[in-house]
Amino acid sequence: MSDSLLDLLQQTLEREMPICTPMGIKAKTWDGSRLTMQMPLEPNRNHQYSAFAGSLNALCTVVGWGTVFLLLQSQGLTGNIVIRRGRIRYFRPVRAPKFVAASLPVDEEELAYFYELQRSKGKTKIDVSVEIRDEQGPFVTFSGSYVVQD
């Protein structure tokens, strides 16, 4: 989709979540339902030379937040986005020099309800799933519940 939306997201993250800059988190793609973001290993590694679990959690949380941000922007909606709850599972160590986390598309009915509540009440919530994976399967799966309020 629009590079301008990705640019807006990146600028917003750098301004509102400054930890994203030293972590090297970068918005890569947005197709209207799925956001991908990339992060380098080196500033986010642990003593085992694999990605630090806290950095992986932060990346997945930001991808979920960014997905909600872009969904709202795509409909001309705004609001304060916060994570209410997150659940993460680690399956294998991440050792690639750069790796990508991707949100999974939200169910269409759930998305329609999300938009309807924000328009009518100025308050809504949505669950977003995120994965870091390769051709062999997932490294990390994350599910976050996000709340939006005017």
PLM regions and their residue ranges:
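HotDog/MaoC-like acyl-thioester-processing domains
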Residues: 95, 105-150
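Short histidine-centered beta-strand/loop micro-motifs
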Residues: 47-51, 92, 115
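A generic structural signal for short beta-strands and their flanking turns/coil linkers
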Residues: 23, 33-35, 77-86, 98, ...
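Catalytic strand-loop segment that frames the active site of acyl-thioester-processing enzymes
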Residues: 19-51
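Short structured motifs
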Residues: 21-25, 84-90, 112-115
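Hydrophobic beta-strand-centered segment that forms part of the acyl-chain substrate-binding groove
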Residues: 67-101, 105-107
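A short mixed-secondary-structure module that forms the rim of ligand-binding clefts
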Residues: 44-71
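Extreme N-terminal tail/first-helix region
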Residues: 1-17
